[in-house]
A protein has these predicted regions:
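Core catalytic lobe of class I
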Residues: 2-260
Length: 260
């Protein structure tokens, strides 16, 4: 296995069957470049917060622009490897995450939600908070994004339409949809402000009409949220496990079957 992976690395892009359930140890950006396009379902990121933790590694970037540029090096690769149906979670402090927001969205991600993890008063660690000029932070912030598959779907369907020589009117009729004002077809391929991802039922019809075999699971997000859970998590013990790193995340937090 190791020799096979080495050969793959010499040739560049790795084969997913060789790295599934494996840990890639190396420079993040370099290793990301070797992962195939649109092959990753879920990305969980915990980058340096930047000037939050009193450690040398959190002060490597002098300015906001330097930090943002570095983050975009690996975020650009992530936007390439994540599936159209993929999800992304990034840990951080809101006051620094906001520096990344615009760039992340421009890479094709859609902001879905902010998740707050309540770490409790113990997270203050005996610090003197009376001199603070803000409320003491006892939470962990996670931003949840999905990848915007609509532009890809639009281009893909329009190409199939062109290849088959079909008109929008013909497609709408075969879909059993209204044909005035562009019809339902324009929701997927036009410049419609109500642009949307087709339902699974509609996708099946489009497969038959446009003669393609692209599974619905490849273009549409699936959410496995358990009843009773919200975007505030207060059942995670940050102090039960042995801590080897100042921003270490508990195993339970990363094993959230409620979400990912």
């Amino acid at each position: 296995m190791e020799e096979q992976i080495k050969k793959q690395r010499i040739n560049g892009i790795l084969h997913m069957s060789d790295i599934l359930n494996q840990i890639l140890l190396g420079d993040c950006v370099k290793e990301l470049k070797r992962i195939p396009d649109r092959s990753i379902d879920l990305v969980i990121l915990d980058p340096p917060y930047w000037k939050i933790i009193n450690e040398r590694w959190d002060f490597e970037w002098r300015t906001k622009d330097e930090y943002t540029a570095w983050c975009m090096e690996w975020f650009t690769e992530i936007s390439r490897i994540i599936k159209l149906s993929g999800s992304l979670y990034i840990f951080g402090y809101t006051r620094n995450l906001v520096y990344l927001y615009r760039n992340i969205v421009e890479l094709g991600f859609v902001f879905r939600q902010e998740i707050i993890v309540d770490k409790g008063m113990r997270s203050l660690g005996g610090r003197k908070t009376s001199t603070y000029k803000m409320f003491p932070t006892v939470t962990e912030t996670i931003w949840f994004f999905t990848f915007n598959s609509k532009p890809y779907i639009k281009d893909f369907l329009r190409k199939r339409q062109k290849d088959l020589g079909l008109t929008a009117l013909e497609i709408n009729k075969r879909l059993g949809a209204k044909v005035n004002g562009g019809g339902v077809w324009s929701l997927y391929t036009g410049n419609n402000i109500l642009a949307q991802v087709p339902t699974e039922e509609m996708w099946t019809k489009l497969q038959e009409i446009l003669k393609f075999d692209l599974p619905y699971t490849e273009i549409s997000q699936t959410f496995n949220i358990e009843l009773g859970y919200t975007n505030v998590w207060s059942d995670i013990d940050f102090y039960k496990e042995k801590r080897l790193h100042k921003t270490q995340k508990p195993v339970k937090l990363l094993d959230q079957k409620r979400v990912w």
